[in-house]
Amino acid sequence: MAAKKYSAGVKEYRQTYWTPEYVPLDTDLLACFKITPQPGVDREEAAAAVAAESSTGTWTTVWTDLLTDMDYYKGRAYRIEDVPGDDECFYAFIAYPIDLFEEGSVVNVFTSLVGNVFGFKAVRALRLEDVRFPIAYVKTCGGPPHGIQVERDMMNKYGRPMLGCTIKPKLGLSGKNYGRAVYECLRGGLDFTKDDENINSQPFMRWRQRFDFVMEAIHKAEAETGERKGHYLNVTAPTPEEMYKRAEYAKEIGAPIIMHDYITGGFTANTGLANWCRDNGVLLHIHRAMHAVLDRHPKHGIHFRVLAKILRLSGGDHLHTGTVVGKLEGDRAATLGWIDLLREQFVPEDRSRGIMFDQDWGSMPGVFAVASGGIHVWHMPALVTIFGDDSVLQFGGGTLGHPWGNAAGAHANRVALEACVQARNEGRDVEREGKEILTAAAAHSPELKIAMETWKEIKFEFDTVDKLDVAHK
């Protein structure tokens, strides 16, 4: 075979990176992008440009291409599809050889897939809709420190969703008053309480004060109720060294679970903390603060299903997923899709839920889906139906806003949850019969009755901004 010769100049991307005849390998990492090209840029060229800029390409031919096997290492745009109901954009499917990515590094994956390519002038908007991580790559990642079953065994809680609460006000409480709020919620019937995502170590409450008062509250509530209790102690910090210092102290005082803001804190920090939690027997709750900056626009950014997959690889035992019924953005079908991607071992392609590829997680443990944001007792039937048992239902204002106080709010939520779980186990349609189920339970629980009266008119009926494209058909 004649040796390839270097020929300087600029070629159209499609000449190298548009390969419609390519059949993806089981070891390829596959990505689906939604591309809105600039006027005058055709689909094949735009798709090839994204494949090039997210893998081996640059704007001109370079002689060093001849020093490696470009045909092996390049990304390949292999399929284009219409976006239902939108003529401006299209789906581009791109295959990347696994050797483009460092083993076990979600940071390296994102640096390629959502790096400079998102500022590329040939596209007006670009969104990463889904990624298929090959099982060969999944096996290089640590994943959740413990997973669903191990957490249930550690906390001795089975057969129902867990109940939680974010302490409010989220900022401004002293350590002692914060601990008191935690105690009231836990003794009332909750399994967990939680630091809000922006509680770190501010002047009004330094982290060590909070940790000490919270653990005092946990021990007291456990002694009174005979149940295991926990509080998500947020160890997110300005530096990794400080983060580990806080995590070590939490372990020292007996905390069963800590918390990290995985997007603002960074994927490197999150993976390191997940490894530490695995080695030290501490559960890890993950908050998704900043996700909507990346995932809310329907044409530009990163879809949350990708952020959820990245978190499962990076490591976390819980992840906030939205509620569908609460105050935060969330399409029902899409939410059900990424809940499955967090918990199941194998998730097949399902366009009705926005899942573009089969995803095999092998033996990687699952992640608890956390429903939080503007929910109260009236939402309980829908939440139990949507999220199932392997979830944490967190009622912040829906606990602390009870007219009789935190303990009464917690008690109301526990009674509502157990009534819905019992009805479901009896074969009833919990979502359809929710009002009847809750009303019957409230006859024996004045706390639930008052909660139902307090929040009977509270609804969040704004339309979802980021709808599934299938819904536009």
Curated annotation (Swiss-Prot):
Binds 1 Mg(2+) ion per subunit. Keywords: Calvin cycle, Carbon dioxide fixation, Lyase, Magnesium, Metal-binding, Monooxygenase, Oxidoreductase. The active site is at K168, H287. It is an enzyme of class 4 (lyase). The record marks K327 as: Transition state stabilizer. SUPFAM superfamilies: RuBisCo, C-terminal domain (SSF51649), RuBisCO, large subunit, small (N-terminal) domain (SSF54966). GO terms for biological process: reductive pentose-phosphate cycle. Its EC number is 4.1.1.39. It holds the Pfam family RuBisCO_large. It catalyses: 2 (2R)-3-phosphoglycerate + 2 H(+) = D-ribulose 1,5-bisphosphate + CO2 + H2O; D-ribulose 1,5-bisphosphate + O2 = 2-phosphoglycolate + (2R)-3-phosphoglycerate + 2 H(+). Substrate binds at N116, T166, K170, R288, H320, S372. Mg(2+) binds at K194, D196, E197. The keyword Oxidoreductase applies. Its cofactor is Mg(2+). Transmembrane segments: none annotated. The keyword Metal-binding applies. The modification N6-carboxylysine is found at K194. InterPro entries: RuBisCO, RuBisCo_large_chain_AS, RuBisCO_lsu_C, RuBisCO_lsu_C_sf, RuBisCO_lsu_fd_N, RuBisCO_lsu_N_sf, RuBisCO_lsuI. GO terms for molecular function: magnesium ion binding; monooxygenase activity; ribulose-bisphosphate carboxylase activity. The basic functional RuBisCO is composed of a large chain homodimer in a 'head-to-tail' conformation. In form I RuBisCO this homodimer is arranged in a barrel-like tetramer with the small subunits forming a tetrameric 'cap' on each end of the 'barrel'. PANTHER family: RIBULOSE BISPHOSPHATE CARBOXYLASE, RIBULOSE BISPHOSPHATE CARBOXYLASE LARGE CHAIN. RuBisCO catalyzes two reactions: the carboxylation of D-ribulose 1,5-bisphosphate, the primary event in carbon dioxide fixation, as well as the oxidative fragmentation of the pentose substrate. Both reactions occur simultaneously and in competition at the same active site. Heterohexadecamer of 8 large chains and 8 small chains. Belongs to the RuBisCO large chain family. Type I subfamily. This is Ribulose bisphosphate carboxylase large chain. It comes from Thioalkalivibrio sulfidiphilus (strain HL-EbGR7).
